[in-house]
Curated annotation (Swiss-Prot):
PROSITE patterns linked: HSP70_1 (PS00297), HSP70_2 (PS00329), HSP70_3 (PS01036)
Record PTM Phosphothreonine, positions in chain: T198
Residue ranges, annotated region (Disordered): 600-632
Induction (record text): By stress conditions e.g. heat shock.
Descriptive protein name: Chaperone protein DnaK
Sequence intervals crossing the membrane: none
Lineage top rank: taxon: Bacteria
Gene Ontology molecular function: ATP binding; ATP-dependent protein folding chaperone; unfolded protein binding
Family note: Belongs to the heat shock protein 70 family.
Key words of the record: ATP-binding, Chaperone, Nucleotide-binding, Phosphoprotein, Stress response
Length: 632
């Protein structure tokens, strides 16, 4: 039975883990790292790079290197947060065919789900390389504060990558699951999760294998990327003040600034000061310009202090919704790379009044929890019950544009709730059910999840028809809505798909593209391997001709030179079949030459004097050891 893998699909980095017996193993990728940058690049030659390979070439290819795309997943192009992101990244964020925010590289448009699918495919390959068998099922994590559109888009990404997503699980819940598997860890815990692009906080009760989420809160547009942006802005402003040149308008310089900002931020977690040195960052009429600047930890903290403070308000709301005080929290778990920053640790310590737990790896704990949940779903781990919640209230628009809640935020899922509504006008033949998610009082101020019509209502005065609207949220946090006319029994049901979102046809097309690309990647790899083999063989045969030419017949020499020439010609092109054919011919010639050399060597008379360096004969002589005592 194949394993279920646990994937932490992060904004900045991703991680994959599996359950082996009673232990969870975080898997190393092909580069030997336990986390993989969530980056995709498209090169001039049409090659697609994922992870570290994409990150390495980002400075020279900024417009076609895509990162932090998770911040766009499930969002409309007109979303104000998307407009903010457009100014921060060197690649193009464009309007998708469905009105969602998509990205563009090398003239091609990609849905964020598609880009995420490339990262998930890399995680899938990592697991398959370790297990030595195909992997088809996964548990994927999302920020707890993701809405329905974002969850659905993440599930779509899994499908595009060829994975059956058994469960979408909230990141803080996954972290708590990993932490609580040690039976000693019980009580009311807070998970503070500050990652690359999102912030979440969850309050959970753990005990006797039951993990019950009491409340969750967060901000899906607050994370390490925003901290980096502050440093980039500071560096660019300082350079502009000194040199009069705005580096933010230069994509290449902006990418170099981003790398430097990220590196400086990490270094300042363990040092008080760091130097940023970027030679030849730009040039003007007077010549090349260099950026050299010292950045202290104190300066970094002053640049990002308001961002850290922004994380505390969701913490207050989460405590209030859970009905507990900070003093009742027994443990605080830190998740996400940003929680390594001393100022963040200090803020969390002050808020909760206790030292955060340090016995979890903030980069790996979420993937570990996802792997545990995968094992629970497979039945490999028993006596574990996970009770999660929906992060946002769900409801419909009623008369006057009011948002009428059917399911309140922090309701345990899965759940189902019904309410009866009526018509607003006499003889109304149909009703439109508009579904929203959020906490504002007016429907238009919340996130629209979609709408559908219930038609064929019999004529009746306003207020008489009874229309029962039912909301059903599954364990993934994904919403189904139905409306039923109680008089006629007529029913209309939809699985909510955002007004944008990807249709099944879109997903199927992207799956086929992913499969086609996988085949193209395989062909490209085969061509590279064939080139390496051909070049190595050419070198070997040429060496033998040069060093042992006198032992090889002229006819064989001519055949070898012809085969070498044919192989060199094939090496100039991209035809794998032609290169394979030329290499096979050269390989046969190489064997023939090898046999001739061996034969010539074995036929040489033993003891025949070999030529010395100056052409004279060198003779092997017998000698007798003389005992000096006998001749004294």
């Amino acid at each position: 039975m194949s394993k279920v893998i646990g994937i932490d699909l992060g904004t900045t980095n991703s991680c994959v883990a599996i359950m082996e017996g009673k232990d969870v193993r975080v898997l190393e990728n092909a580069e030997g790292a336990r986390t993989t940058p969530s980056m995709i690049a498209f090169t001039d030659s049409g090659e697609r790079l994922v992870g570290q390979a994409a990150k390495r070439q980002a400075v020279t290819n900024p417009s076609n290197t895509l990162y932090a795309v998770k911040r766009l997943i499930g969002r409309r192009y007109d979303d104000p947060t998307v407009a903010k992101d457009k100014d921060l990244v060197p690649y193009a964020i464009v309007r998708g065919d469905n009105g969602d925010a998509w990205v563009e590289a090398r003239g091609e448009k990609y849905a964020p789900s598609q880009i995420s699918a490339f990262v998930l495919s890399k995680m899938k390959e990592t697991a398959e390389a370790y297990l030595g068998e195909p992997v088809t099922q996964a548990v994927i994590t999302v920020p707890a504060y993701f809405n329905d559109s974002q969850r659905q888009a993440t599930k779509d990404a899994g499908r595009i990558a060829g994975l059956e997503v058994l469960r979408i699980i909230n990141e803080p819940t996954a972290a708590a699951l990993a932490y609580g598997m040690d039976k000693k860890n019980t009580g009311t815990i807070a998970v503070y999760d500050l990652g690359g692009g999102t912030f979440d906080v969850s309050i959970l009760e753990i005990g006797d294998g039951v993990f019950e989420v009491k409340s969750t809160n967060g901000d899906t547009f607050l994370g390490g990327e925003d901290f980096d942006a502050r440093v980039i802005d500071y560096l660019a402003s300082e350079f502009q003040r000194e040199q009069g040149i705005d580096l933010r308008k230069d994509k290449l310089a902006l990418q170099r600034l981003k790398e430097a900002a990220e590196k400086a931020k990490i270094e300042l977690s363990s040092s008080k000061e760091t130097e940023i040195n970027l030679p030849f960052i730009t040039a003007d009429a007077s010549g090349p310009k260099h950026l050299v600047l010292k950045l202290s930890r104190a300066k970094l903290e002053s640049l990002v202090d308001d961002l850290i403070q922004r994380t505390l308000e969701p913490c207050r709301k989460a405590l209030k919704d859970a009905g507990v005080s900070a003093g009742e929290i027994s443990d605080v778990i830190l998740v996400g790379g940003m929680t390594r920053m001393p100022k963040v640790i200090e803020a969390v310590k002050q808020f909760f009044g206790k030292e955060p737990a340090r016995n979890v790896n903030p980069d790996e704990v979420v993937a570990i929890g996802a792997a545990v949940q995968g094992a629970v779903l497979k039945g490999d781990v028993k006596d574990v019950l996970l009770l999660d919640v929906t992060p946002l209230s769900l409801g419909i628009e009623t008369l006057g544009g009011v948002f009428t809640r059917l399911i309140d935020r922090n309701t345990t899922i899965p759940t189902k709730k019904s309410q009866v509504f009526s018509t607003a006008e006499d003889n109304q033949p149909a009703v439109t059910i508009k579904v929203y998610q959020g906490e504002r009082e007016m429907a238009a101020d919340n996130k629209s999840l979609g709408q559908f019509d219930l038609t064929g209502l019999p004529p009746a005065p306003r207020g008489v028809p009874q229309i029962e609207v039912t909301f059903d949220i599954d364990a993934n946090g994904i919403v189904n809505v139905s409306a039923k006319d109680k008089a006629t029994g007529k029913e209309q049901q939809i699985r909510i798909q955002a007004s944008g979102g990807l249709s099944d046809a879109d997903i199927q097309r992207m799956v086929q593209e992913a499969e086609a690309n996988a085949e193209a990647d395989k062909q490209r790899r085969a061509l590279v391997e064939a080139r390496n083999q051909a070049e190595s063989l050419v070198h070997q045969v040429e060496k033998n001709l040069k060093e042992q030419g006198d032992k090889i017949a002229e006819a064989d020499k001519g055949e070898a030179e012809s085969a070498i020439s044919a192989t060199r010609t094939a090496l100039e092109g991209d035809d794998l079949a032609a290169l394979t054919q030329a290499t096979e011919r050269l390989s046969q010639v190489a064997m023939k030459i090898g046999e001739a050399m061996y034969k010539a060597q074995s036929e040489a008379p033993t003891g025949e004097a070999e030529a010395g360096p100056n052409g004279e004969k060198v003779v092997d002589a017998d000698f007798e050891e003389v005992d000096p005592k006998k001749h004294s």
